[in-house]
């Protein structure tokens, strides 16, 4: 039972673009809303993987930078001040005898009248740097995410990786850092050709094909030892910060154990965006139905459907069809 517990109207699992818009819309329906996100920042893959890439298929935007879209969604959502829980992964989800959902994460327990899952392709975690002692530098000056570029101003930054994320972060940091060095184990980068061209024409130091073999430092990383893949020549670089962009591993993980109808790694929903468990809804890339198309734009359309039906679920007196937003503010 959930007496004396703080029970939210809607708890959203996943803080990507669909989750952020779901939170805004839930607030607009005068619901108390909580977002639980496994990453240390909101924005999902847009923020973590390609913040500087342009998106061209969001209605009303001829083009919009991924991080700009996330920032706008966060600003829109702030109007209703939802509760945000970062670096929390939901491990179990169950409906109690009183109908309230109990969500247990790696940090705490949450209670909610309804749940909307907007987890994209599932919780995803970075591929970590597999060097002795690397873990002790995490949350110091070894980074897998960048939430504020300004903290790298006038610093010597090393970026590991050869894909879009690594090249994007190098280009973004190049104007503000004292020096940016990008390290890739292959001769050629996997990033978009235009981005690679910009990288070559920037003042960033490019070292290929090299791999890191040692991190030197006590409290923080002070030097990185690199080894040439072919000649095995070693180079030592002085650093202030290290950013690792080796990609991410995503998985539905514990979601598969919650009793939901899952087909081809997606949660099956009906026209209400409702799962096979009443009170649990899904929207965005994590869900599937006949004719489903996995696009951000589609997730934005599914979010209001999920919220309005969730509202009617936990408050049967509420109207399913809301007022138009132009009449509300």
UniProtKB/Swiss-Prot annotation:
Catalytic activity, as annotated: 2 reduced [2Fe-2S]-[ferredoxin] + NADP(+) + H(+) = 2 oxidized [2Fe-2S]-[ferredoxin] + NADPH
EC number: 1.18.1.2
PANTHER family linked: THIOREDOXIN REDUCTASE 1-RELATED-RELATED
Cofactor binding description: Binds 1 FAD per subunit.
Superkingdom, taxonomy of origin: Bacteria
Essential cofactor(s): FAD
Organism, as annotated: Bacillus cytotoxicus (strain DSM 22905 / CIP 110041 / 391-98 / NVH 391-98)
SUPFAM superfamilies given in the database record: FAD/NAD(P)-binding domain (SSF51905)
Family from the record: Belongs to the ferredoxin--NADP reductase type 2 family.
Binding-site list for FAD: 18, 37, 45, 50, 90, 124, 285, 326
Known partners and oligomeric status: Homodimer.
Keyword field: FAD, Flavoprotein, NADP, Oxidoreductase
Gene3D superfamilies on file: FAD/NAD(P)-binding domain (3.50.50.60)
Protein name as catalogued: Ferredoxin--NADP reductase 2
Record's keyword annotation contains Nucleus: no
